[in-house]
Curated annotation (Swiss-Prot):
CDD domains xref list: Ribosomal_L1
GO molecular function, one term: structural constituent of ribosome
Designated gene of the protein: rplA
Protein name listed in UniProt: Large ribosomal subunit protein uL1
Pfam families xref list: Ribosomal_L1 (PF00687)
Lineage, opening ranks: Bacteria, Bacillati, Actinomycetota, Actinomycetes, Mycobacteriales
């Protein structure tokens, strides 16, 4: 048995699978069950009661986490002229147009998010098949197709996350690092969950939040009580 398997098993026995934890309890337990030596990412997985094959039940959104993600995102911006200068001043990691598109077509993908001014989208469409499957395609719905590139870059650098329901009706998003204290993790969880709840499709019937788990990278899933939709930092 590998050391990582042993560490996972040791962590997993600390989680009572029959219990539904509060967000604060889950955050604390996630820190305790992190089975890597590195500062693990803390993630949330939610099973929604929607039919994601239907356009009117697509759940997709963004939220600015109050305490950030613990990682400074690398941002690429598609812009020219004054907007390109503004993007550079705002802290974008790479800015360009045709040159940036050619670089990406050549296999370069060393960025975590992409922003584009509206006039660049016809060009960016040429690499949609590269960016789309990786969740990197700029989109007006997530605020990443905008003339206000400074705000878009600042939001992403400040801890803005995107989420989108997949074909199996699951959502996945990051709420921080294992080095965060549990209150900060719980507050980030609360901010994200409130946005997920706000986006509930009117056509969705039955229970909306079917299952919620919190975990660290390589750590066991910790079941969270899906009925807790406020007072996230209470035990």
């Amino acid at each position: 048995m590998s050391k990582s398997s042993k560490a996972y098993r040791a962590a997993a026995v600390k989680v009572d699978r029959t219990n539904l934890y509060t967000p604060l309890q889950a955050a604390k337990l996630a820190k305790e069950t992190s089975s890597t030596r590195q500062d693990a990412t803390v993630e949330v997985a939610i099973r929604l009661g929607v039919d994601s094959r239907k356009a009117d039940q697509m759940v997709r959104g963004t939220v600015n986490l109050p305490h950030g993600t613990g990682k400074t995102a690398r941002v690429a911006v598609f812009a020219v002229g004054e907007k390109a200068d503004v993007a550079v001043a705002a802290g974008a990691d790479v800015v360009g147009s045709d040159d940036l598109i050619e670089k990406i077509q050549g296999g370069w993908l060393e960025f975590d998010a992409a922003v584009a001014t509206p006039d660049q989208m016809a060009k960016v469409g040429r690499i949609a098949r590269v960016l789309g499957p990786r969740g990197l395609m700029p989109n007006p719905k997530t605020g990443t197709v905008t003339p206000d590139v400074a705000k878009a870059v600042a939001d992403i650098k400040g801890g803005k996350i995107n989420f989108r329901v997949d074909k199996q009706a699951n959502l996945h998003f990051v709420i921080g690092k294992a080095s965060f204290d549990e209150k900060r993790l719980a507050e980030n969880y609360g901010a994200a969950l409130e946005e997920v709840l706000r986006l509930k499709p009117s056509s969705s019937k039955g229970r909306y939040l079917k299952k919620v788990t919190v975990s660290t990278t390589m750590g066991p899933g910790i079941p969270v009580d899906p009925s807790i939709t406020r007072n996230f930092t209470e035990e």
